[in-house]
Amino acid sequence: MVVIHYTAMADAASALERLCDASAEVSAHYLIENTGEVVQMVQEADRAWHAGAGEWGGLADINSRSIGIELDNRGTHPFAAAQMDALEELLRGIMARWPVPPEGVIGHSDMAPGRKTDPGPRFDWARLERQGLAAPARQFEAGDAEAYICAAQAAGYTAPCDFDTLLHTTRLRRAPWRTGPLCAADFTL
């Protein structure tokens, strides 16, 4: 599994300093600067402290079973083209070295609904999907809230949370501009 994050810090240097500070108790395998430079901080086979509490596809302890990639971005602006190019190249390499399918490339928000929002609404998931580097959207039969919860769980959203948090989290990835009550379009997950 690969978990994509944004740093939510002023710049890459500040993020790198924090990610390498043992007292901060946070780390990731990689940091990709907005220039496209890739910095490896933890070996891929080693555990990093990037995911925290959460679950994806029925699996917990995400830190022990994933590679964390931090993107130098505050979460409020578009991701640089050079950064996305570098991310695509890095993901291709990781997916060649490890048994990570496109369905295993997720955002921090996907596995920690309500607790995390990264990589955020500005992240271009469709770009990764077109390259086969993230799972394409699946269409589920529209229905009521119970049907939606079942569909979301089938898509991987198994972390415990209330309905509104689940809806917000799935929209963050598939339709961050959508608001209001559950609708048929929300069943594209």
Where are each of the predicted segments found?
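Basic/polar, cationic surfaces and motifs that engage anionic cell-wall
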Residues: 75-189
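Active-site-adjacent loop/helix surface patches within enzyme catalytic domains
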Residues: 1-103
